[in-house]
Regions:
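Polysaccharide-binding surfaces and accessory modules of carbohydrate-active proteins
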Residues: 78-79, 85-89, 208-230
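Acidic, contiguous internal or C-terminal segments within carbohydrate-active enzymes
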Residues: 51-52, 56-62, 162-215
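Beta-strand-rich N-terminal accessory domains
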Residues: 36-82, 86, 112-122
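C-terminal motif of bacterial Sec signal peptides marking the signal peptidase cleavage site
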Residues: 16-17
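Sec-dependent N-terminal signal peptides
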Residues: 5-13
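Conserved small/polar residues in nucleotide/adenosyl-binding loops
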Residues: 231-237
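Extended, loop-rich substrate-binding clefts of extracytoplasmic carbohydrate-active enzymes
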Residues: 26-30, 34-44, 51-53, 121, ...
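Active-site loop/turn microenvironments that scaffold catalytic and metal-binding pockets
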Residues: 78-140, 222
Length: 237
């Protein structure tokens, strides 16, 4: 009987050891990269970590080109995660959302899911109250990008979208490059090439909470957009 208790105790200790990852294997935000490793539509997903010399950290998964966490120092130097995200790829798959995603082919709404191109009317999926939102129900936020970690601060993601993807015309090769600068800025650059006239409108869909605590409200956050042009949309756009 004592032997059985001893074996059970050893098994419990081994299980506990497996469930408690050493801090060195976790990201600064506490993410376990192993929980982002799976296969979606025959493509491998993973978590990529960017770090600069100042200690800032950005975690990105190639599933949807999503920013998962941004650890940045507050005014007192305390590191805080300022974006909303999930702790595993399973959560992103099982709870569909746009958290942190690279949106495409077309961000925002296309009225009634229709647009005219060279005199032809293109009908898209209507996935949002009769309109096409964020490229349709199978938009790029649910695709697996090919990832290339260029250096510790730069990640390039590439996605090939075939002609007719969600009924958009043209074969499109899209690239999203994330660059973490040494002055704690995130530079996101988008580019796309196509073999046929089409429409493209890419963006990032991160949700920020500068309190660094998702249980606190963000209603007192102030955002400044350094833009030369402003587009105002309505419920149908």
């Amino acid at each position: 009987m004592k032997k059985h208790f001893l074996l059970a105790g050893i098994a419990a200790l081994m299980l506990a050891a497996c469930n408690n990852k050493p801090a060195s294997e976790l990201t600064l935000s506490g993410l376990d990269p192993a929980k982002f490793q799976t296969e979606v539509n025959n493509a491998q997903t993973a978590l990529y970590t960017l770090k600069n010399k100042a200690g800032m950290e950005v975690c990105i998964t190639n599933f949807g080109g999503r920013i998962v966490s941004i650890m940045v120092p507050d005014k007192n130097g305390k590191m805080q995660d300022v974006v909303l995200g999930f702790d595993s790829i399973a959560d992103y798959i099982n709870v569909p959302s746009d958290f942190g995603a690279s949106i495409g082919r077309y961000a925002n709404r296309i009225n009634q899911g229709r647009f005219v191109l060279d005199g032809d009317t293109i009908q898209l999926p209507q996935n949002n109250f009769g309109h096409c939102l964020h490229g349709g129900p199978k938009g790029w936020q649910y695709k697996v990008y090919e990832a290339n970690l260029i250096d510790p601060t730069t990640l390039e993601l590439t996605l090939v979208s075939p002609d007719g993807d969600e009924n958009f015309p043209g074969n499109v090769t899209a690239k999203v490059t994330y660059k973490l600068t040494e002055d704690n800025a995130i530079d996101i650059k988008y580019s796309a090439t196509t073999d046929k006239k089409t429409i493209i409108n890419m963006t990032n869909h991160s949700y920020f909470n500068l309190a660094g605590d998702p249980s606190k409200t963000s209603t007192d956050n102030i955002m400044y957009v350094n833009a030369c042009l402003l587009y105002t949309s309505d419920a149908a756009d």
